[in-house]
Amino acid sequence: SFAMTPEARALANNFASNKGALPWPVERGIITGKFGKHPHPIVKGVIVDNPHIEITTEENAIVRSVFEGEVSSVVPIPGANVMVLVRHGNYFTVYSNLINVKVKAGDMVSLKEPIGTAFTDEEGKTMVQLGIWKDADIQDPNPWLAK
């Protein structure tokens, strides 16, 4: 680990001070998958441990960065289409289940800048996963988002 530059520290402080006020990554949606450990909604006796929340949204929904930052990586994930990682100082936001990704590693993104499109499966369900990390610690994204 290395010391943050003054700019990165300022960005991290800004990110942290916006807890509870971050915009949602999509304009319309509902949280259909909770963060953390909870019983599987269908399979009895199975515990799900989600490192993110799942937001169900409308078809062709544009997924936007919830804060300004730098795209750290764009990675194809088997079964989750493409994942985009955006760095905000020592905070990261992770967006997965994206298609038509508009950004690449090294790009600077602004607040609410489109980064891709939420994927729609064969059953017509459109969903994006949002994760928030502080260094290596996974955060529950729900309290970070504006209500």
PLM regions and their residue ranges:
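Extracytoplasmic/periplasmic cell wall- or extracellular glycan-interacting regions that localize
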Residues: 1-73, 78-81, 87, 129, ...
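Conserved beta-strand positions that form and line the central face of beta-propeller blades
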Residues: 54, 85, 94-97, 117
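Short histidine-centered loop motifs in beta-beta connectors
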Residues: 74, 90-108, 112
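Residue-level structural signal for beta-strand termini and adjacent loop
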Residues: 77, 98-99, 120, 144
